[in-house]
């Protein structure tokens, strides 16, 4: 049983690492897309996005 548990935890850590990398790439792409948007819309979205990013960094 212990052996099975160990293998499971190992696979989970690997999956977690991959997930983090993917989320980072996705957020980057979204930012680029927003920048291309209209100026008025960009200002509003940028402020909201910055707040979210700051909170995430603090948590980390």
From Swiss-Prot:
Assigned keywords, A-Z: Chromosome, Developmental protein, Differentiation, DNA condensation, DNA-binding, Nucleosome core, Nucleus, Spermatogenesis
This protein's GO CC annotations? nucleosome; nucleus
Principal cellular location given in the protein's record: nucleus
* Tissue expression as described in the entry: Testis.
| Any one biological process term the GO annotation gives | sperm DNA condensation
GO molecular function per UniProt: DNA binding
Q: Which organism is it from?
A: Phascolarctos cinereus
UniProt lists the family membership as follows:
Belongs to the protamine P1 family.
What's this protein's function? Protamines substitute for histones in the chromatin of sperm during the haploid phase of spermatogenesis. They compact sperm DNA into a highly condensed, stable and inactive complex.
User: Where is this protein found?
Assistant: Nucleus; Chromosome
| Keyword DNA-binding set for record | yes
Region annotation (Disordered) maps to: 1-60
What protein name does the entry list?
Answer: Sperm protamine P1
